[in-house]
Amino acid sequence: MRPFILLALLFSVAIAFNIFRDEAVPEEQLLSVRRSTRGADKKADSSDSSDSNEKDDKVTEGSGSGDTPVEAEEQLRRVARDVEEASGEEEGSGAAQVTSAPVRFVRSVDVEGSGSGDEAPAE
């Protein structure tokens, strides 16, 4: 009787975890909802929503580190200028080394054909 109760408890916890996990909303979906509501706000009343839209643009278009788009552009210009200076000094090398650039991280990657390749197909 006791193993049956433990098994039932295990199944109920697993089911509750799966339901909770399925209800989580991915970040991309939240951003698309924010953009669609922003578009609806522009159509309804552009004067009231312009301030919040500018704030949302700064948040969604930044580099992820809290930089505003203007700061990100300045950083890119600085990196490009450093690369041009380095390539101008090393005239014959044909390659310049970039030492700093904004980096965006990918949350997950789908890998196709991730098998080891040692297995022969079943015939």
Curated annotation (Swiss-Prot):
Signal sequence, start to end: 1-16
Annotated glycan sites: S63, S65, S87, S93, S114
Statement: the UniProt record of this protein carries the keyword Glycoprotein: yes
Region (Disordered): 32-123
Keywords: Glycoprotein, Proteoglycan, Signal
Coiled coil segments of this chain: none
Compositionally biased tracts (Basic and acidic residues): 38-60, 74-84
Protein name: Chondroitin proteoglycan 8
